[in-house]
């Protein structure tokens, strides 16, 4: 292969998009990621006598270190002393050992090819710090020995996935909702607006609703058998007998999985500001919990997601200075230069798994059209397929890494060896 050309069609670059909720990875040039598994991983620390539990599907960390259980199947098996942890905090890598375990697992189980053969394009949070970027670059070159590397901001990749190089990316994921202005493929740092009202917040609201309605949350791992019961009558189920002593963090994770299913099946955003009378007229949705308890949900379906758009009616948020989704967008545009605002309003791109709640985009479109200055043309871009919206930054990375014109952008191993880890600041905006 000729000296300096990496990537290209024949080498197959890998694209990693590691979010707070799931990890997405696969080959550049394909239309969707090969793998999509939870970022949360199970961790069992060795006992004092050095014995661990059965080693079947665990990935052993360093000698004497913890054992990691990664991927849906391994994570959801109840095990004694297994904590559910996440390597990320605020979208940035916090725990490097478990982060490395995720990469090891992906290479071993899914890529099934030598790390040293594939250039890697990785997505990163727009607010990622210099120290973390350099550490990541060092890890990829030194530990995985990859031939070339590139780091790109998630918002820029989302814009590319939608065929734009300028636009305002509204990304609502698990941990936060952010508006990120992108101009000519660069993130405008001063215009980033973040709000903690996102998927995890909705999960929390659902939890409170279940407590109020006295609905017991029983994750499937505890259930040995259940009987069909009438709507609204108490559940009739048998508990599994030999359950190990699970940790609270893992049990919580399993409960959240149940709630997330409920979120996707039941919730809907109201077309206009939430109104008791209108909500009462809404058709109800029937939902059955894993333990067999089932009932209809009416007004609650609209009330819970309302907090995303109108945080003032959420009880328990003290002082409440948080911004609703449409405010996040308008505030962000307002912080950018006046000349580029038309370009931002002209392509507001919606991305992230949390935006898949029914009618989310309709409500956003309606609120933004009321707030957009009359001189601006508003255009909301939202893919209607779940795949494209959940994986938008991965798809953008897949497009970018397979472009012929991108091939001179890679940080090659040679450049890394000559310039050290500082070259990531110079080559990856």
Swiss-Prot record:
The modification Phosphoserine is found at residues 86, 233. InterPro entries: Actin, Actin_CS, ATPase_NBD. Changing residue 377 to W: Found in a patient with developmental delay, speech and learning difficulties, dysmorphic features and abnormal digits; likely pathogenic. Changing residue 227 to Q: Found in a patient with developmental delay, speech difficulties, attention deficit hyperactivity disorder, behavioral problems and dysmorphic features; uncertain significance. Belongs to the actin family. Component of numerous complexes with chromatin remodeling and histone acetyltransferase activity. Component of the NuA4 histone acetyltransferase complex which contains the catalytic subunit KAT5/TIP60 and the subunits EP400, TRRAP/PAF400, BRD8/SMAP, EPC1, DMAP1/DNMAP1, RUVBL1/TIP49, RUVBL2, ING3, actin, ACTL6A/BAF53A, MORF4L1/MRG15, MORF4L2/MRGX, MRGBP, YEATS4/GAS41, VPS72/YL1 and MEAF6. The NuA4 complex interacts with MYC and the adenovirus E1A protein. This is Actin-like protein 6A. It comes from Homo sapiens (Human).
């Amino acid at each position: 292969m000729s000296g300096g050309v990496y990537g290209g069609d024949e080498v197959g670059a890998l694209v990693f998009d590691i979010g707070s909720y799931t990890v997405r990875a696969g080959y550049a040039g394909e239309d969707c990621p090969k793998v999509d598994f939870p970022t949360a991983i199970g961790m069992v620390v060795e006992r004092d006598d050095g014995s661990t539990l059965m080693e079947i599907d665990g990935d052993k960390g360093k000698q004497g270190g913890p054992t990691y259980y990664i991927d849906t199947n391994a994570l959801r098996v109840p095990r004694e002393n297994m904590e559910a942890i996440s390597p990320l905090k605020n979208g940035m890598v916090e725990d490097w050992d478990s982060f490395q375990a995720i990469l090891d697992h992906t290479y071993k189980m899914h890529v099934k090819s030598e790390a040293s053969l594939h250039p890697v394009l990785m997505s990163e949070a727009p607010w990622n710090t210099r120290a973390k970027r350099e550490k990541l670059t060092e890890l990829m070159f030194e530990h995985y020995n990859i031939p070339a590397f590139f780091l790109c901001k998630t918002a820029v990749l989302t814009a590319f996935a939608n065929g734009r190089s300028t636009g305002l990316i509204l990304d609502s994921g698990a941990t936060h909702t952010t508006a990120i202005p992108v101009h000519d493929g660069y993130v405008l740092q001063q215009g980033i607006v973040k709000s903690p009202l996102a998927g995890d917040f909705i999960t929390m609201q659902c939890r409170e609703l279940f407590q109020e309605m006295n609905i017991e949350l029983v994750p499937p791992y505890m259930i040995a058998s259940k009987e069909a019961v009438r709507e609204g009558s108490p559940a009739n189920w048998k508990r599994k007998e030999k359950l190990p002593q699970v940790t609270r963090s893992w049990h919580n994770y399993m409960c959240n999985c149940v709630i997330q299913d409920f979120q996707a099946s039941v919730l809907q955003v109201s077309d206009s500001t939430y109104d008791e009378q209108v909500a009462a007229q809404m058709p109800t949705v029937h939902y059955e919990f894993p333990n067999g308890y089932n009932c209809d949900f009416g007004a609650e379906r609209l009330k819970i997601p309302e907090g995303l758009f109108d945080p003032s009616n959420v009880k328990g948020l003290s002082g409440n200075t948080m911004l609703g989704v449409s405010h996040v967008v308008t505030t962000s545009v307002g912080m950018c230069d006046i000349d580029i605002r038309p370009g931002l309003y002209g392509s507001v791109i919606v991305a992230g798994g949390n935006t898949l709640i029914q009618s989310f985009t309709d409500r956003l479109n309606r609120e933004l059209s009321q707030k957009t200055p009359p001189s601006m043309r508003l255009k909301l871009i939202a893919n209607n397929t779940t795949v494209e919206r959940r994986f938008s930054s991965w798809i953008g990375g897949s497009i970018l890494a397979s472009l012929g014109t991108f091939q001179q952008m890679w940080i090659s191993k040679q450049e890394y060896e000559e310039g050290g880890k500082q070259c990531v600041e110079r080559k990856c905006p």
